[in-house]
């Protein structure tokens, strides 16, 4: 599993691995490895704010620049991403503000999809846009962001209800499935972090 992750990510960006373990015999190109003591590892973990970043990656709400947010709901049949504006978009230039917010949201949604390893059917409920040209800009932004994804991703376009429909091939478990487990206290309707 580790070798696959290193290979996939090192192909796009150089990676430095900090670990208490000795490196595998063969490291993919672009990977450097540094073996640390337990104390050094804890300090590096704390300095990189790893726990905070993991909590953010598992959070349902993702803040956007400008005050908006994404709300990500993973379900058995599909995953939905709802784009919320930071303020009510009702001014005369409301359509322009909506498109700008949607373009920011498209970039962050694509990043979250990769980060969380979301797959299957994905529906994104962008802020309402009335212009076909504006919808085309948002589709182009999603296609550009998806082009960086090694996993096969297809943008199908907007549905008649105005939802952006896309699919992404499942290659392994989602981040949520990997790092959390069903909550026994609520009979499996919620999830808690694994130990």
Q: Model-found features: residue ranges?
A:
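OB-fold/S1-family RNA-binding modules
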Residues: 1-76, 178-195
